[in-house]
């Protein structure tokens, strides 16, 4: 057993990997590759220690359970393969519908009977009366989504009005997927297509290796991810020109400049690694929201119907949680009443001596005078 522990390799962790990946899958979030390897190494060490602590008979049973797990993983692999084939099949069936949507949104074709309705007396009140297609379709759809609305700044909106279409596709080498954003000619950047690509360690589980975005070719003075600060020189200064400083600012277009894992991660401390992982998880969340929600249900987000559906689902979840909480509270109240009755029977009756003083948390002196924790702004 000791020799196996010294010669441990990540390839020996097949039994541990599905469990770690499943935990990430439940939250549908990505993790850092190197952090995952560290965890797997740790799991492997724990696995060896656990087996060494078992009696031979129990260890033999556990080894047999691991063989069963291996059989399960083989079946699971077939499931992933068949699921990918099924998704590819239906993706092809969706494509003609997405093409029709593109043509209508961008005014390439007109809906049958679209111009047959009699002109309304109040037609002049509608700003889009003479517009082609559906103006601001993708901008409105994305702004309606809670995750994406936090990313889209007011200064981004004029540029996103030129967004004509969003598509996604799987990639095989390396495994992952990409998002393509198609833009009409605009005064902000030269690119007609902005692409975001996600490389996955495992296509079937959301374990992110890295993300790559298109470098945006901004026109001079139009970079929405930067702001230029001008500071007047001090009085009496020889340099009369204002001092300019460029700062990075919040923008949806930062999505195309994703956080990167350094090539040499040995010098990264735990706090920096946690911060980087949080950034990558958030970036992945944005990408999957666009892929899984916005693209397939764009018109429902445009009209707001998708929000109502999500709110309804959240209400159902909250009601179930409230019911569970109510049951727990009732059980606790019953237990408290029983304990109070027993205490009343066992204690002699005394006159009230005023409200009891509660001990300070953590046993600290003068707990009442200590301020509550606050987050630094």
Swiss-Prot record:
The modification Cysteine methyl ester is found at residue 374. It comes from the Eukaryota. This is Nucleosome assembly protein 1;1. Highly expressed in tissues exhibiting active cell-division activities, such as root and shoot meristems and young flowers. A lipid is attached at residue 374 (S-farnesyl cysteine). Residues 33-87 form a coiled coil. Residues 375-377 form a propeptide. Residues 308-343 have a biased composition (Acidic residues). It is found in: Nucleus; Cytoplasm. The keyword Chaperone applies. It comes from Oryza sativa subsp. indica (Rice). Residues 306-377 are annotated as: Disordered. Binds preferentially histone H1 in vitro.
